[in-house]
UniProtKB/Swiss-Prot annotation:
Record's bilayer topology term: Multi-pass membrane protein
Designated name of the protein: Probable protein kinase UbiB
Gene Ontology cellular component list: plasma membrane
Function statement: Is probably a protein kinase regulator of UbiI activity which is involved in aerobic coenzyme Q (ubiquinone) biosynthesis.
Chief localisation class: membrane
Pathway: Cofactor biosynthesis; ubiquinone biosynthesis [regulation]
Pfam assignment, any one: ABC1
């Protein structure tokens, strides 16, 4: 083991001892040989002064002491309310990703290396004092030679070895937890760390963030709801991002918003509309919309517009996930728990062999108390969290895209009610969802669906051959994997498209037109059924 890794291990051990995290560990239902360690560990042989801190606060402070990589891991973990006790999740939400800035001259050197030019050749002004500094990057204000006011984001130097080292220890801890604890295995700690690994490495590529920002800007071009700063692609590199500098009011600065006479009700409702527009219209949503990344334009306080920055983390849903999510929400608010359970099974979110009656009863037990509150006080985010918590007891697979969506919804919802406490999220979202559902089954949408799937017809023969080969192989009678339901649905919709195409050809005077219109009618009817069935 390398000296650096040993030093890091000793550092982790000191933090564990300082914040009594070993006490939290031994409170868990562990195997006897691990519980016996409480009598073996040397630091437990002597009396220790008790800490007047909750378990969540101790964990939060420990992660802060361990540095930026553990801080960001804690922030991501705080969004997994389907896995964590509420008190711990609430404490982890308070983690602040603030670290001292690195040397400004080093920042200038890194920017010049990435751009291949001197700072003075690109910028007429460059502020060496950073505007902000976080664990992954820091930001400087500047002005381009062409006159535009911009911000320059630069990745911290030497991050990859630190990230690799800390991730290695996180994986070791996660694998150990899965081996020794059945309860830990249900939480899939290795999967959680794997998701974090992907997220943290994605954040190191600023070209990815630039592309996300450009896509989001294009989606809301000309919209009164949301403004996204312009990316200056000529000066963007993997470790440097140059984009328009924005001036606005921090969304949590309620006093300044009030002084501007901002319409708080409209501002809160527009936040909800932005969220549902991103999720259902665009299937591309900003997944890191905490208050530090959201501002409000000062231009029209009576018609307030949001400004979003930091698009490093985004999420997207498949059309199937969009459809099932919308239907789940409608079924939930109708208290149709059987429908909710069936939709979870149909979507492949829980195994196909799940007992519907038991799943329905579990959902009813958890969710029915929610309706004791007035409708305006019901939390969408809490609804999703409760549904996912229940589904995990029935072996629901981790759905990273739904985790991001739940996190974003909780942020938007909490923010909306902070701005306007009487925000009725359901009444605000319901018209949008109903309109989206109607558009999904409109003739135009069906035609587009048919056209897109008609393009896949050349692959139909290959799919059929592959299907026959799989059926002929051993284990063909094993229970189908979770993804099989969706594959089968896609195959049937493709078959439906073929029927629609064939029926259209017959109706237009194909080779069998002398048989009359009834064969074409049957083919079109069967095709429509297969295409729109759920």
């Amino acid at each position: 083991m390398k000296l650096l890794a040993v030093r890091r291990l000793l550092r982790i051990q000191r933090v564990v001892i300082r914040y009594r995290l070993d006490d939290l560990l031994f409170d868990l239902p562990l195997p006897w040989f691990l519980l016996a360690l409480r009598y073996v560990l040397p630091w437990r042989w002597f009396p220790r002064k008790p800490l007047e801190l909750s378990r969540g606060a101790r964990l939060r402070l420990a992660l802060q002491d361990l540095g930026p990589i553990f801080i960001k891991f804690g922030q991501i973990l705080s969004t997994r309310r389907d896995l964590l006790p509420e008190d711990i999740a609430d404490e982890l939400m308070r983690l602040q990703d603030r670290v001292p800035p690195f040397d400004s001259q080093l920042s200038v050197k890194l920017i010049e290396e990435q751009l291949g030019k001197k700072i003075s050749e690109v910028f007429s002004r460059f502020d060496v004092e950073p505007l902000a500094s976080a664990s992954v990057a820091q930001v400087h204000a500047a002005q381009l030679k062409t006159g535009e006011e911009v911000v320059v984001k630069v990745i911290r130097p030497g991050l990859k070895p630190i990230i690799a080292q800390d991730l290695a220890w996180l994986f070791i801890l996660a694998r150990a937890a899965e081996k020794v604890s059945a309860d830990a295995r249900l939480l899939h700690p290795v999967d959680v760390v794997s998701d974090y690994e992907k997220t943290i490495y994605d954040e190191l590529d600023l070209l990815r963030e630039a592309a996300n920002a450009s896509q989001l800007k294009r989606n809301f071009e000309g919209s009164p709801l949301l403004y996204v700063p312009q990316v200056y692609w000529d000066w963007c590199r993997p470790k440097v991002l140059v984009m328009e500098r924005i001036y606005g009011i921090q969304v949590t600065d309620l006093a300044t918003l009030a002084d501007q006479r901002t319409d708080m009700k409209m501002l809160a409702e527009r936040g909800v509309e932005i969220f549902f527009t991103q999720v259902f219209r665009d299937s591309f949503f900003h997944a890191d919309m905490h208050p530090g990344n959201i501002f409000v334009s000062t231009v029209n306080p009576w018609s307030p517009q949001y400004i979003a920055i930091d698009c490093g983390i985004v999420g997207s849903l498949t059309p199937e996930d969009q459809d099932y999510l919308a239907r789940n929400l409608f079924a939930f608010f109708k208290r149709d728990y059987r429908r909710v359970a069936q939709l979870h099974i149909d979507s492949g979110w829980v195994p196909a062999e799940t007992k519907l009656n038991e799943f329905e009863a579990a959902i009813r037990t958890v969710c029915e108390p929610i309706f004791e509150k007035p409708l305006k006080d019901i939390s969408f985010g809490q609804v999703l969290m409760r549904l996912f918590q229940t589904a995990r007891r029935f072996n629901m697979e981790v759905q990273p895209q739904l985790v991001l969506l739940q996190k974003t919804l909780l942020n938007i919802e909490g923010l909306g009610r902070q701005l306007y406490p009487d925000l009725d999220l359901w009444n605000t979202a319901q018209p949008f969802l109903e309109r989206w559902m109607r558009e999904r089954v409109s003739p135009k949408a069906l035609l587009g669906n048919v056209q897109s799937q008609f393009e896949q017809l050349p692959h139909l023969a290959n799919m059929a051959r592959d299907l026959l080969e799989r059926m002929s192989q051993p284990h063909a009678n094993d229970p189908p994997p979770p993804w099989k339901k969706r594959k089968d649905d896609w195959f049937l919709r493709l078959l439906g498209s073929a029927h629609l195409a064939g029926g259209t050809i017959l109706a237009a005077g194909g080779p069998l037109h002398e048989l009359g219109h009834w064969p074409a009618g049957i083919m079109v009817a069967v095709g429509l059924y297969l295409v729109v069935r759920r």
